[in-house]
Every structure is written in structure tokens, then in C-alpha cells.
Amino acid sequence: TVAPQAALSDVLFLLNRYQLSRLPVTDGQKLVGIITRTDIIRVEADQLGGVCQLPQRSTPSYVVYQTRSPAVGTGRILLPIANPDTATALFKIAAAVARERNYEIDCLYVITVPRLSSPAEVRVDTREGRKLLHRLERLARQQNISVHTQISVVQDIADGILATIRERHSNLLIMGWTGEKSTTGAIFGFSVDTLIAEAPCETILVKLGTKDCFPNDLNRERIWLIPTAGGPNAQRALALLPSLLSLSESSDHPELWLCKIYSPTELLPDLSTLEVLQASLQKAIAQPVVPLPIRSASPAEAVINLVESEDCSLVLLGASRESLLNQLLNGNIPSTIARAVNCTVILVRGELSD
């Protein structure tokens, strides 16, 4: 294997030395790609032909604090944190996913500076960030999870997070969202919209609810609502369920309601998709799942009413980048639901395809 920083001459030497056609590129135990002889020939041909690839535009950022734990995971979660009041709850979710998938966690604290300032030259106070990161490191040690921490000075939050995703080869981005309505025309807020549109890895957006909602709802009876329209978007959300369920004891799992919204004009709605999804989910998690077909002209309103009437503690939604960013006639459905309910809402957007 070779590291991502290896020179092409070193790669070519190894290919010739061991008579190989390709080599895995690894960062620690994580496979980040494959390099072949064809790749090397293509780069050499481009250089001989005068083809120059312009570097990607990036906003300057500067690392002022960093810790590293053993690189023992098969992947990495990037967890940007800023608010001490929500950091622990977000870390609980990230830790549950890390245990389930054998991932490490990168905790990132960003400090913003004006556009005209150089992040490398501005004096910043890192005490608050280091205090917060130390708290998460203690939680990680208690749970035997490999955690890395970093404080970066950036001019733009979204650009700083995207740069970290590229540098750390992140497999998953988990970020919090306050649920507040943007005044700039953005759906979730400018930085979050940018990350939903551009982050190449799987992305999970978490709007935390009140203190009695997930993941702090273990001392009461609770209902988790999973609205679905079927297809790959639903599978993304359902794939997260085993990780989330691991936060509660097996004897005290929440009730799972799998709901699908049907148009009132459908006299005989096709329930087969809902039934198949219910059966596969029950088999995967070995727990009862309640199928819930609902007639409504407004999917968002139907979900909101159900959450309020049944006091759900979590709503789990799967969505594509397009459905998260496109403004529908009645507004963006996931953001409408997330803003209207008091419980925790988790939105899952899959990895972007090339």
C-alpha cells in the first residue's frame, strides 16, 4: 500500500518491483482509493501535453490546535461542534454510529475571522474550544472510541469544513442545526445549505429537540417516527437505525412507527411498498415495527400533526440532496417538519455520486 502523500516515482517503483498493476492508497487502516499504471501514464501525458489542472478554490484556513488518537478505524466521522449545550448530545449520536461502523471521530471546532484577515496571522482565543474538545475526549475514552480533535481558524465555516473532509477523507459528516429560519433565503442556513450541496460524503443533519427527546429520552416511553416514500432515500435513514437503537437497552427500545403518506385521491392505495419495507426493517433490527399508512394532501402537515398528537421523541428522514435543497410549492418538506416540531429530527443525505 501507499499513503496519499506518496510521490508518483515511489508508486511506480513499487509497481515495477512487485510486478503489480495497481496499488491500494490507504490513510492508516482506511482505504481511500486505488492507483494504477494507467493513472500514472495519464498524469505524465497531461504534463507532456501541457495540460494544467487548476487547483480547487479554497478559503484559507489555519490549524492552531490538534490532537491525534490511534488510527484504528475503517472510516472517519467529521463532527463540527460549536455549542457546549448541544455538543454532548451530538457526540452521543456520533459515538453510536462510530461503534456500529468501526469508525473514528474527528471533532472540529472552527473560529471565524474576517475575509480580509489571514487566518495564519490573527491572534485567536482557543480556550473555549479546547475546553469543549477536552470534554468530548473524556467521553470518548469512557466509550473506548478513537477521537481526534482540531481547532481551525477559517474565513468561512462551510469552506473550512469541506477542506477538513478532503484532508481527513471523511466518510460521514454529522452536524447540528438550530432549526431557526434563515433570513437570507437559504433553506437551512447558508453554511448548512453549502455543506448539503457540496459535502461528498454521507451527511446527517441533526436538529435536537427538548431535554426529553432523543438522545436524552431514555427514561420515558417513546415513539420514533420514520416517514418514508420508499426508494434509496428511505434506506439511508433506515440504515442508521441500528446505531441509534444501540443508545438504549434492548429491553427498553422505543416504539418504531414507519409511516407513508398517500394522496386522498387514491381510492385503493398500494401498501405493498410499506409492507415490504416494514418486513425488511423488522428482520434487520429484530424488533417490531408498526406500519402506518396515512391519507393527506400535505405530507409535512401530516407528519407534524402525528408528532404533536403522539408526543414522538424522534423523527428520522432520508432525503437526497435535491429534495433537501429544492424549494417545493409548499416549501421544503424536511425543513418544514424540522422547524415545526419540538422533538429531535435527523435528516440523512447519502454520499454524492460522481
Predicted segments with their positions:
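A short, acidic, amphipathic alpha-helical segment used as a generic capping/interface helix at domain edges
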Residues: S272-A279, R295-D311
